[in-house]
C-alpha cells in the first residue's frame, strides 16, 4: 500500500536547510541520557521504548524526494531490539555518549532515531536517545523521556498501558497548512514586517581568535551553575519587579552584547515552543521555531525599564510566534536582497522536565551537546531536572572563540548581574562590563609602561650632547651631500644666531616651506635652538590652507628657498628667509644656550581636522624625547641608519629625524622618485645599508605587490597610518624572514606612535595595534567612556607621560 506523503513543516524546512549546509555532520542531532538511579529491568525498559515509538508517529517519520521535493511519510511500526552496553563508570558513560552523539544519520528513507540502553555493575542504568531534529525538538525529547519512564513504571507495576495514546504529528502538518490560508497568518505577517521596517546591524561578540581555520560549525560547550546566593537574589528581584527569570537574563545578556557590539539596536534569536494548544504540547515532533527578538538599548534606559520592555516584547512575539522566520526573511529580502540572517547569537531558556516531579520512578536527564552549531554562539539558560538551580551553557564555534573567551564572557555577565542586583534602576550607560580583575590588569599591568628617559632635557640639549660624543660621525645624508654631527650643529647655530638677530624670540612660530633636503633638517634645529616652534608646511599645499595655517599659528617667519618664493607671494605679513643665501651661515657657530620654559613646544603639525579647517597640534619637546629615548617598541642597536621616507609635515618624520639624531645614528633622506620606484628603493636600501625605515600602509602594500623581498637588507620596518593588510604583511614576512615588522599606530596628538605591535606570526584577518609605548597609556572605552575589556573594539583613549 502506497504511503501518504506530506510536505515538510516550516520548522522542519529550517532544519533541512541547515542539514544541507552542514551535510555529513551531526549538527542536527538531539541526544539525551536518561539515568535511573535504581536497579533497572532492561527487558521492560526495552518494551517501554517500543511502545512509545509505536504510539508516536513522529518517531517513524521517514524522508524521501518526490519530483525534486523533500517529502515525509510514516513508516509502519515493527518491534525492534534495543542494544544494551555495560558501563563501568560515569567517565566511561560520558565517553560513550560522545560516540553516540556524533553518529551521523542518513536522512533519506531511514529511521532518524536510535535508542541504546546502558547498565552499570550494580544494575542501575538507563538509556541514551539520539534523534534527528527533523523528527523532534528539545521539548519532544523531554516529553519522550518522561513518557518512556511513565510506561516503564506501569510495566514494572504490572499495570495496563492500553490507555496511553499520543496525538499525531500529521494534525500539526495539516493545521499549519490551514494557518497559511488564515487571517491570522496575514495579521502575523503584518506584525513582523512592521516590526522590521528597519533592519538593525547584526551583532557579534568579539573573540581572541584570529585564524579561523577550523570547520566553521564545530563547537564546544562550557557550562556554569549560578551560585545559590546570587540566584536567590535574582529570584527576589524578579518577584518584586514582576519580570521573569528569562527576561532578567535576556536583559543582562542584551546589555553585554550591545556594549561589545557597539550597537543600540540589534537582534537576538530565541527559540519558542510554537505549540499553540494543549494537544500540541503533548505531541512529539519538530515544532520549535526561532524568533528574532529586536533589542533597543538607546537613551540610557534603566535596567528595570529594559527588563519590562523585554517582557512586553516577548508577550507580543508569543502572540505572533507561528509566523515562520523563513517567511519573514523572504519578506525582507524581497525589498532588499542584501539582508543577511538577522542574528548570529541565540539565547534560550529551557525548563523541560515539568512532569519529573510526579514520576514514581526517579530519573535524571542529561543532554549531550553534539559539538556543532550554526550560530557563532548559543547561550542556554536552563534547569532541566527541576532542581531549582539555574545553569548557563555556552555552545561556541571553536573557529571563533577559545574556552578562555567564554570564561571571560561569563565572568563579565556575573559582573553585570552584581551591578543590577545592587541597583535595579542603574542606567545602561553606567553598567561596566569589565570585571575588577580585568580592570586591574588594564590599569596596572597593560598600562605599566613607565621607563626612565631624559624627560627634563630638551631636544636641543640632547642633540648638543650627542655632538659632543660623536662630532665626526655622519649625522645626515641627502644624495651626495652629507653632514657630520659637528657640521650640522654649526650650521644650525649660525642660522639660529641669524634668526635671533632678525628678532626671533622664545615661543615664536617659524614656518618651514621646503622639500626634503639637508636644509630642512638645519632649519628645524636652528628654530629649536632659538627656543621657537617650527611649523612644517608642504610645498604642494593650496594657498587657502597655507594662509589658514599661517594666520592660525601666528607665524612670523618662513624659512624657504628662492625657487619657492613665488608660491608665498600672497602671504605679505610673513617674513620670507631664503636658506640658499650663504650669508646666513656666517654667523656665530657657537651654541646659543638659551634658557627655555620647562617643556617648550617643539613643533605645530596641522592635521586635516574634522570641521573643514586644518587642526593645529602642538607637540612639546618632552613628547619627542619620550618617543625616541629609552623606548620599548623598538630596540636600537649601534650604527643604525634610519631612512626619512616622508615629508616633515607628517608626524612619522618625528621618529625618523629624532630617532636618528638624538641617538647618534645616521639619518638618510630619500628623494620621492627613489622612494616610489620599487627597483630604485631596493637599490637605495642595499647601497646605503639602511637598517630602519617607516612606510605608510598604502605605500607598503604597493611596494609589496611589486617585490615583497625588497626589504631583505633591512633590520626593522615600521608601517601604519592605516589598517594593515595581513596578506601583504604575510607576503613580506615569508620573503624576508629576518625582518622585524612593527605595526605603529597613533594620532598626531600623541606624537607619532601611541601603540606598537611587533608582528611575530602570520595573521588571516586583522593585525593588532599592540601595546602602549613607553611612558604612554592606552584605554579602549565605550561611547559613554566605560572601560572595555581587552579584545573588545571601542574608542581609543591615549595619553602620554603625566609625570
Predicted regions and their residues:
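Short acidic/polar active-site loop segments enriched in Thr and Asp
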Residues: 244, 264-266, 505, 556, ...
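Carrier-protein-dependent adenylate-forming modules in NRPS/ANL systems
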Residues: 1-167, 206-207, 232, 242, ...
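A short secondary-structure junction motif
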Residues: 199-203, 631
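Short, highly charged C-terminal tails/helix-capping segments
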Residues: 429-441
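Generic preference for hydrophobic
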Residues: 72, 84, 115, 268, ...
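Short functional linear motifs
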Residues: 13, 42, 141, 189, ...
Amino acid at each position: 500500500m502506497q504511503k501518504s506523503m506530506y510536505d515538510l513543516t516550516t520548522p522542519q524546512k529550517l532544519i533541512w536547510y541547515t542539514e544541507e549546509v552542514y551535510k555529513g555532520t551531526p549538527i542536527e542531532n538531539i541526544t539525551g541520557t536518561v539515568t535511573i538511579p535504581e536497579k533497572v529491568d532492561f527487558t521492560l525498559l526495552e518494551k517501554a521504548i517500543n511502545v512509545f515509538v509505536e504510539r508516536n508517529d513522529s518517531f517513524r517519520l521517514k524522508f524521501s524526494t518526490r519530483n525534486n521535493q523533500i517529502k515525509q511519510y510514516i513508516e509502519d511500526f515493527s518491534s525492534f531490539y534495543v542494544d544494551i552496553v555495560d558501563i563501568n563508570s560515569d567517565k566511561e558513560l560520558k565517553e560513550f555518549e560522545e560516540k553516540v552523539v556524533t553518529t551521523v544519520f542518513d536522512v533519506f528513507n531511514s529511521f532518524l532515531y536510535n535508542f541504546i540502553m546502558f547498565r552499570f555493575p550494580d544494575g542501575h542504568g538507563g538509556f541514551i536517545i539520539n534523534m534527528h531534529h527533523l523528527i523532534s525538538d528539545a521539548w519532544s525529547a523531554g516529553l519522550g523521556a518522561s513518557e518512556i519512564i511513565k510506561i516503564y513504571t506501569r510495566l514494572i507495576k504490572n499495570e495496563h498501558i492500553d490507555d496511553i495514546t499520543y496525538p499525531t504529528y500529521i494534525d500539526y502538518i495539516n493545521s499549519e497548512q490551514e494557518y497559511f490560508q488564515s487571517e491570522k497568518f496575514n495579521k502575523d505577517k503584518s506584525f513582523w514586517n512592521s516590526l522590521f521596517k528597519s533592519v538593525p546591524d547584526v551583532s557579534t561578540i568579539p573573540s581572541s581568535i584570529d585564524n579561523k581555520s577550523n570547520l566553521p560549525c564545530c563547537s564546544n560547550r562550557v557550562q556554569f551553575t549560578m551560585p545559590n546566593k546570587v540566584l536567590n537574589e535574582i529570584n527576589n528581584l524578579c518577584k518584586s519587579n514582576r519580570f521573569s527569570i528569562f527576561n532578567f537574563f535576556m536583559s543582562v545578556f542584551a546589555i553585554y552584547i550591545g556594549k561589545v557590539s557597539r550597537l543600540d539596536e540589534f537582534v537576538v534569536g530565541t527559540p519558542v515552543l510554537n505549540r499553540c494548544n494543549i494537544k500540541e504540547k503533548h505531541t512529539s515532533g519538530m515544532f520549535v521555531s526561532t524568533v528574532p527578538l529586536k533589542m533597543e538599548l538607546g537613551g540610557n534606559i534603566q535596567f528595570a525599564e529594559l527588563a519590562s520592555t523585554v517582557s512586553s516584547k516577548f508577550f507580543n512575539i508569543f502572540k505572533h510566534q507561528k509566523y515562520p522566520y523563513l517567511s519573514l526573511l523572504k519578506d525582507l529580502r524581497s525589498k532588499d536582497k542584501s539582508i543577511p540572517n538577522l542574528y548570529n547569537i541565540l539565547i534560550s531558556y529551557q525548563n523541560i522536565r515539568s512532569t519529573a516531579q510526579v514520576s514514581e520512578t526517579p530519573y535524571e536527564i542529561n543532554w549531550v551537546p553534539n559539538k556543532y552549531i550554526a550560530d557563532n554562539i548559543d547561550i542556554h539558560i536552563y534547569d532541566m531536572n527541576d532542581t531549582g538551580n539555574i545553569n548557563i551553557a555556552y555552545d561556541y564555534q571553536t573557529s571563533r572563540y577559545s574556552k578562555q573567551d567564554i570564561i571571560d564572557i561569563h565572568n563579565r555577565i556575573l559582573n553585570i548581574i552584581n551591578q543590577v542586583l545592587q541597583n535595579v534602576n542603574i542606567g545602561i550607560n553606567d553598567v561596566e562590563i569589565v570585571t575588577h580583575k580585568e580592570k586591574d590588569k588594564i590599569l596596572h599591568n597593560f598600562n605599566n609602561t613607565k621607563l626612565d628617559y631624559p624627560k627634563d632635557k630638551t631636544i636641543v640639549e640632547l642633540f648638543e650632547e650627542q655632538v659632543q660624543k660623536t662630532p665626526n660621525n655622519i649625522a645626515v645624508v641627502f644624495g651626495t651631500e652629507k653632514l657630520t654631527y659637528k657640521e650640522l650643529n654649526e650650521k644650525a647655530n649660525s642660522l639660529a644666531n641669524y634668526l635671533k638677530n632678525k628678532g626671533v624670540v622664545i615661543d615664536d612660530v617659524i614656518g618651514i616651506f621646503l622639500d626634503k633636503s639637508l636644509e630642512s633638517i638645519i632649519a628645524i634645529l636652528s628654530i629649536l635652538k632659538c627656543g621657537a616652534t617650527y611649523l612644517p608646511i608642504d610645498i604642494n599645499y593650496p594657498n587657502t590652507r597655507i594662509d589658514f595655517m599661517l594666520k592660525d599659528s601666528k607665524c612670523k617667519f618662513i624659512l624657504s628657498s628662492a625657487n619657492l618664493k613665488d608660491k608665498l607671494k600672497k602671504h605679505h605679513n610673513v617674513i620670507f628667509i631664503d636658506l640658499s643665501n650663504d650669508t646666513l651661515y656666517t654667523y656665530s657657530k657657537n651654541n646659543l644656550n638659551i634658557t627655555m620654559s620647562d617643556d617648550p613646544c617643539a613643533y605645530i603639525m596641522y592635521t586635516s581636522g574634522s570641521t573643514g579647517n586644518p587642526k593645529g597640534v602642538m607637540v612639546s619637546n618632552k613628547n619627542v624625547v619620550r618617543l625616541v629615548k629609552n623606548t620599548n617598541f623598538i630596540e636600537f642597536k649601534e650604527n643604525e641608519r634610519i631612512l626619512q621616507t616622508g615629508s616633515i609635515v607628517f608626524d612619522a618624520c618625528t621618529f625618523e629625524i629624532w630617532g636618528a639624531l638624538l641617538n647618534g645614528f645616521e639619518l638618510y633622506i630619500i628623494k620621492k622618485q627613489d622612494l616610489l620606484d620599487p627597483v630604485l628603493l631596493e637599490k637605495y636600501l642595499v647601497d646605503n645599508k639602511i637598517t630602519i625605515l617607516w612606510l605608510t600602509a598604502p605605500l607598503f602594500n604597493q611596494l609589496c605587490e611589486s617585490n615583497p623581498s625588497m626589504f631583505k637588507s633591512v633590520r626593522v620596518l615600521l608601517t601604519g597610518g592605516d589598517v594593515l593588510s595581513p596578506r601583504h604583511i604575510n607576503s613580506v614576512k615569508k620573503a624576508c624572514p629576518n625582518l622585524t615588522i612593527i605595526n605603529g599606530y597613533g594620532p598626531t596628538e600623541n606624537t607619532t606612535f601611541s601603540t606598537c605591535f611587533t608582528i611575530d606570526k602570520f595573521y588571516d584577518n586583522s593585525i593588532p595595534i599592540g601595546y602602549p609605548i613607553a611612558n604612554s597609556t592606552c584605554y579602549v572605552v565605550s561611547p559613554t567612556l566605560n572601560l572595555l575589556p581587552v579584545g573588545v573594539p571601542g574608542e581609543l583613549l591615549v595619553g602620554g607621560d603625566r609625570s
